[in-house]
Amino acid sequence: MQYYDEVQEVNERRKRRILAYYEYIDARTRDQMAEVVHKLIEQRQSQGLSQQNIAEATGMAAPNIARLESCKRIPTMQVLAKYADAVGMEINIEVVPIAKNVAEED
C-alpha cells in the first residue's frame, strides 16, 4: 500500500506543477497580448480612428473590434495583423530568453 501512496503523491505533485505551469503561461500570454493590443489602441486613437473605422478597414464586425480591445480573449495573429495593418503598423514577433521557468521549479 505504501508504494501506491507514493506513486499517487508523485502524480499529484506532477499535476500541480503542470497546472501551475499552464496558469503561468496563460497569464504571461494574456499580459503580452494585452500590451500589443494597448499599443494598437493607442495608435488608433492617435490617428483619430474609431472602432468602426477599424472594422471597415479589416472587414471585421465592430463588436469584434470592441471585444479585441477589451483583452478578454487571446486574439489570433491574423486578427492582430489585420488590426495592425489598418493603423499602419505590423506585428513583429521575437523569441527571447526568459529569466525564470516555472516548470523547472519545485
What are these regions (language model features)?
Residues 35, 75-78:
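Charged, alpha-helix-enriched surfaces in structured cytosolic catalytic cores
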Residues 50, 61-64, 76, 90:
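Short coil turns linking two alpha-helices in DNA-binding domains
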Residues 31, 42, 70-71:
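Residue-level marker of alpha-helix boundaries and capping positions
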Residues 1-38, 101-106:
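N-terminal flexible/basic segments that precede or flank functional cores
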Residues 88-106:
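Short C-terminal boundary/hinge segments that cap the last helix of small helical domains
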Residues 59, 78-94:
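DNA major-groove recognition helix of helix-turn-helix/homeodomain DNA-binding modules
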Residues 2-5, 9-10, 38-55, 82:
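Short basic helix-loop element that most often maps to the first helix and adjoining turn
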Residues 56-74:
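Recognition helix of helix-turn-helix/homeodomain-like DNA-binding domains
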